From Swiss-Prot:
Lineage: Eukaryota, Metazoa, Chordata, Craniata, Vertebrata
Name of the protein in its database record: Solute carrier family 7 member 14
GO molecular function annotations of the record: gamma-aminobutyric acid transmembrane transporter activity
InterPro entries referenced in this protein's UniProt entry, alphabetically: AA/rel_permease1, CAT_C
Knocked-out gene: effects: Mutant mice exhibit slightly thinner retina, including outer retinal layer, and abnormal electroretinography at 2 and 6 months of age compared to wild-type animals. They are viable and fertile. They do not show any noticeable physical abnormalities.
Residues bearing PTM Phosphoserine: S465, S468, S475, S488, S757, S769
Entry's Gene Ontology cellular component terms: cytosol; lysosomal membrane; nucleoplasm; plasma membrane
Length: 771
């Protein structure tokens, strides 16, 4: 019926084809083979990025991008206005939430190590082109605002050290810019403009130069941190933590402070953007992400302890808390020492925002989603110099015209959105069949690869010892190549995998879903948490798994289970969004203990738990990576919940500005990117190739009769017997009747050839029989 209606209305066919074409474009994914180890990534001008970053360099970048504003600004702000001395607990909660997203980032950094676009690249190869552009575009906004805010913060720091003489001179000489910032004294910050330009030049000069500069500032910041810890011990007073003063605003203040403290950990994703420039990204990226978060947590907690023990929480200065806490005790010289650390820390934070921004632009321009001239890599500095200059200029312009307070309000929404998407991608990929994640799972864990190579090498070194006949027949299992030196049964299982004969049965549900030669991945050493759980529960562990419907070790994901996980993750995201919205905007009904509000919260929590449990029941892909996020699906699901909650805590004006930025991005994507992406150009070339040359089916068995052309009745040899190259376009436009006639002729010739062959075989058998 639908075909009949379509034949009556050609516009229906046109709209359907247009929708299908647009749908396929926005959901197309980038093949990952070009980004795997050994392939390298080359810019549009043929120059590769330099691979010079070590694990220490990556840790330094991660720490520097976080610790500046967190230690010198956020600690005092949260302690005074939200949590009091409980800011320590707030930082710990925020760190746990950040680590949840960090482990997901670490797994993606191992899956696609040779990348420059962080969450943009991860989403491009998993979710699709449109979502990838959306995430990349908002990461650019995040880094752009972070750079401008860092330059403005440094300008304010210098102005504070100069007793605000710089700002007064600006207002008296240049004037104010009413409307661009909050307050009547908003002025064009020329000092912030100069700072942004200088840092842009440093980043554009080369990775090694900028990272070296970053390392020097981090060492200086570390020295100031040690000074604060030692000097502060002489002025601490335990009465400021007396009963009733540690949590002056209760646990609600601690949780509110945790939401603010979470922003102090934003920045570790810079590590994921440098994968192409890291010497060994497979191991460096996960280690650097974890280490940087732990170091930042240590710095924040220790500084918060000293701050709240030196000064009552209600007397903390929110603009420069660490400098003023020594002034309160008359130690004026320490103010300038801390000021040096503040300048170093804020400079590193500024560098941490500017460093990844041109690399995201470079990755998007290299894929054709942004203008391709932005992907130019300088052959001298081996950096995306055009992207550096353009992004640095925009950041400098923002720092000149927009106040620091307005910039800070938009700093987190893009990053939180990227964190959420990375958690979603981890959930999707771990439960998809192997055929759906081609390039991601083509390599094994380096540790197991080295272990296998060592076992095989040891086996080859052993010489074969002679064995007597008696030994050979009496012990058929004896190995003649030094069995005592061969690996144990567990090692053999690791090498060849346990045989699952049922999996080779065509009726087995997992038949054909995974390469049978890769049984090694399914029999890897189990997760340490599962081992502890087995010891705790005992034999009932397996009974419990069966009753809960959890998958077995040899179960493999199929297209059906992968689709189930995709639907569950989508519903989980929507339900979490509704749940967090109700918790935030309906808090008065919940606190008022309205029965319908409590019932709705319980119902949504129950539905979220059911969806997570359904995901848990699906089999995971058995491939192992050098680093994998633990405790799936709980860790990514909880990370999604925390990130969505923090996004909804942002102000309304932030969402409005975010919507305007997204609208500009959509104009660029649908006006330029979707038609000029590398995948679109490749698809056009492939379509042109298919329309120019006739494809032949080379899989059919060849017979002698097929080597010749037979003309059917009513059809001359001239019509189709000649070579295809001579027929050109008209050969491809052959009518269906002729094509069917030729197919029937070939089928008859094949049948005749088969009958002749069977007759010949029968005659040969008769000739060779003893009779």
């Amino acid at each position: 019926m639908s075909g009949f209606l379509a034949s009556l209305d050609p516009r229906r066919v046109q709209w359907g084809a247009a929708w299908y074409a647009m749908h396929s474009r926005i959901l197309r994914t980038k093949p990952v083979e070009s980004m795997l180890e050994g392939t390298g990534t080359t810019s549009a001008h043929g120059t590769k990025l330099a691979q010079v970053l070590t694990t220490v360099d990556l840790i330094s970048l991660g720490v520097g991008s976080c610790v500046g504003t967190g230690m010198y600004v956020v600690s005092g702000l949260v302690a005074k206005e939200m949590a009091g001395p409980g800011v320590i607990v707030s930082f710990i909660i925020a760190a746990v939430a950040s680590i949840l997203s960090g482990v997901c980032y670490a797994e993606f950094g191992v899956r696609v190590p040779k990348t420059t676009g962080s969450a943009y690249t991860y989403s491009y190869v998993t979710v699709g082109e449109f979502v990838a552009f959306f995430i990349g575009w908002n990461l650019i906004l995040e880094y752009l605002i972070g750079t401008a805010a860092g330059a403005s913060a440094l300008s304010s720091m210098f102005d504070s050290l100069a007793n605000h003489s710089i700002s007064r001179w600006m207002v008296d000489t240049v004037g104010t810019l009413n409307g661009l910032g909050k307050g009547e004294e908003s002025y064009p910050d020329l000092l912030a403009l100069v700072i942004a330009v200088i840092v842009t030049i440093i980043v554009a000069l080369g990775v090694k130069n900028s990272v070296g500069f970053n390392n020097v500032l981090n060492v200086l910041n570390l020295a100031v941190w040690v000074f604060i810890m030692i000097a502060g011990l002489f002025f601490i007073n335990g009465k400021y933590w007396a009963e009733g003063q540690f949590l002056p605003h209760g646990w609600s203040g601690v949780l509110q402070g945790a939401a603010t403290c979470f922003y102090a950990f934003i920045g570790f994703d810079i590590i994921a953007t440098t994968g192409e420039e890291a010497k060994n990204p497979n191991t460096s990226i996960p280690y650097a992400i974890t280490a940087s978060l732990v170091i930042c947590l240590t710095a924040y907690v220790s500084v918060s302890m000293i701050l709240t023990l030196m000064v009552p929480y209600y007397a903390i200065d929110t603009e420069s808390p660490l400098m003023e806490m020594f002034v309160a005790h008359g130690f004026y010289a320490a103010k300038f020492v801390v000021a040096i650390g503040s300048v170093a820390g804020l400079t590193v934070s500024l560098l941490g925002s500017l460093f990844p921004m041109p690399r995201v632009i470079y990755a998007m321009a290299g894929d054709g989603l942004l203008f391709r001239f932005l992907a130019h890599v300088s052959s001298y500095t081996e950096t995306p110099v055009v992207a550096c200059i353009v992004s640095g200029f925009l950041a400098a312009l923002l720092s000149l015209l927009v106040s620091l307070r307005d910039l800070i309000e938009m700093m987190s929404i893009g990053t939180l959105l990227a964190y959420t998407l990375v958690s979603v991608c981890v959930l999707l990929l771990r439960y998809q069949p192997e055929s759906d994640i081609d390039g991601f799972v083509k390599f094994l864990s380096e540790e197991h690869t080295k272990k296998k190579e060592g076992i095989l090498a040891d086996c080859e070194k052993e010489t074969c010892s002679p064995v007597s006949e008696g030994e050979e027949f009496s012990s058929p299992a004896t190995n003649t190549c030094g069995a005592k030196n061969l690996p144990s049964l567990g090692d053999n299982e690791m090498l060849i995998g346990k045989s699952d004969k049922s999996a080779y049965n065509v009726n087995h549900p997992n038949y054909g879903t995974v390469d049978m030669t890769t049984g090694i991945e399914a029999d890897e050493s189990e997760n340490i948490y599962l081992i502890k759980l087995k010891k705790l529960i005992g034999p009932r562990y397996y009974t419990m798994r069966i009753r809960l419907g959890l998958p077995g070790k040899m179960d493999r994901p199929t297209a059906a289970t992968g689709h189930t996980v995709t639907i569950c993750v989508l519903l989980l995201f929507i339900l979490m969004f509704i749940f967090c919205s109700f918790i935030i905007f309906g808090s008065e009904y919940i606190s008022g203990q309205s029965w319908w509000a409590i019932l709705l919260v319980v119902l949504m929590m129950l539905l979220i738990s059911v969806l997570v449990f359904v995901i848990l029941q699906q089999p995971e892909n058995p491939k192992k990576l050098p680093y994998m996020a633990p405790c799936l699906p709980f860790v990514p699901a909880f990370a999604m919940l925390v990130n969505i909650y923090l996004m909804l805590k942002l102000s309304t004006i932030t969402w409005i500005r975010f919507a305007v930025w997204c609208f500009v991005g959509m104009l660029i994507y649908f006006g330029y990117g979707i038609w000029n992406s590398t995948l679109e150009i490749s698809a056009r070339e492939q379509a042109l190739h298919q329309s120019t040359y006739q494809r032949y089916d080379v899989d059919d068995p060849f017979s002698v009769e097929e080597g010749f052309s037979y003309a059917t009745e009513g059809e001359s040899q001239e019509d189709w017997g000649g070579p295809a190259e001579d027929k050109g376009f008209y050969y491809q436009q052959m009518s269906d009747a002729k094509a069917n006639s030729r197919t029937s002729s070939k089928a008859k010739s094949k049948s005749k050839h088969k009958q002749n062959s069977e007759a010949l075989i029968a005659n040969d058998e008769l000739d060779c029989s003893p009779e």
